[in-house]
Amino acid sequence: MVRKRQPGHAAPAEDVRDDGVRDDGAVDRTTQDPARAPLRADEVRAALLAPVGPLHRCEVVDRVGSTSTELLARLRTDPGWADGGLLTAEHQDAGRGRAGHVWTTPAGAALTLSLAVRPGVPRERWGWLPLLTGLGVARALRSTTGLDAGLKWPNDLLVPAADGTGVPDWGRERKVAGILAEVAPGGEVVVLGIGVNVAQTPAELPVPSATSLVAAGATGVDRTTVLLAVVAEVTGLLARWRAHGGDVAAAGLDAEVAAACRTLGGAVRATLPDGTEVRGTAVRLDADGALVLRAADGSEQPLLAGDVRHVRPVGELGSQV
């Protein structure tokens, strides 16, 4: 039985679950781990809302199933969220990734945010949205933590393993963040979901290929600082992209994404939805953001993010050729 509390009284220890969420549904804010400290909502709004910042809507909520699911629902009834609307949560318990993957984290241990943008460029250029978002997140993580963050096409962020060890199918890097881009009803707005593992310990991580900023060796991590940097970098890159009509070459963004993309230059295998595997060397990104693989016979095949389930390295600590 859950005991009722008087307003203003702290939750008894037995009313707080191991995931940091109290039995009344709120997030426990008594953590002694600075990396799990609550987001400073007033500071976030002051820095990000216009006219100071790039956003028109910004809300920090305590708990939600999925920030993207919630933002998509809000877009159906309130168009004010449509361009420059940000929803971030202290804790989400039904986060979503590509191919229906579920992403859950302990309360206060991650950054979970969704940003609504109106691309305003030809639809065939929207394939760059997750890549540009990933570049922005990578730059934010580098500047705030010093970790060497890079992109794994099409939507993951990698950092070197703290101990330098390798994991099959991933090599000597670990996934620290992921991105999910979804088109909202009406087809004119895209919701960019961003999840960053911040403070999880190795024991709290779901798979050996995952890490967090703290587990990867970052010290003095502050979630509010990382959040502000992520939004600033992502919105700045998207503004450049839109200013050039979505032409990444004209904006110089194709070269910047390529320089940060760990996938390029390596031998990889791509698994298609029907289970078919395509192998080759990842040689470049084409005009719409597709990954171009060159086979042993010299032929090339572009792969669109929506047509691929997994991309894995081939070779040492990767798949066997």
Segments and roles (model prediction):
Residues V2-A10, D28-R36, R123, G127, ...:
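Long, positively charged amphipathic alpha-helical accessory segments at protein N-termini or as interdomain linkers
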Residues P54, W81-D83, L151-W153, T276, ...:
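Short, basic and Ser/Thr-rich N-terminal targeting/leader segments
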